[in-house]
């Protein structure tokens, strides 16, 4: 595919100023994060009322001393695990929920997701879908309810940036509650990996590791 920068164009692409790598955002591939040593205590569920968004969760987590980080730093959105639910529509019309876990400071890129599931299509997960999947608590969805072997039976795929051994704040599948120090590989598993999170300026070039431009 030929790519050339222009003020008005039909696509967004990534370019590395160091090695010259260029690709549209759908074609970018993020390598799997290396395993990390588990460095946190056992996971614990905390009452976090009125925190259905990442911003409110981070604010509450930093305002309560008992929820402070072990290293003394402040919590940020990147410490949270956001679980996004969409409906995958196959060519024959069959609909299947799909759960995607991404770091809380990133969004799922719709174009990348569409490319990843093609020829299936994607539609938004609506209120009627939550009603049909009572294991999902809107605003507080966590890995405990997800996965083909979980209580919801919903396929659960993780962003490749999420390393085995990494710890997260995420939903506890109960209204107004989140779980802290939940470790991937120790406390929960996923059904696979999907690389559909937004690509941002400053991300590592998949070719040489330098910071890319958008």
Language-model features: where?
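Extended, low-hydrophobicity, polar/charged segments
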Residues: 1-214
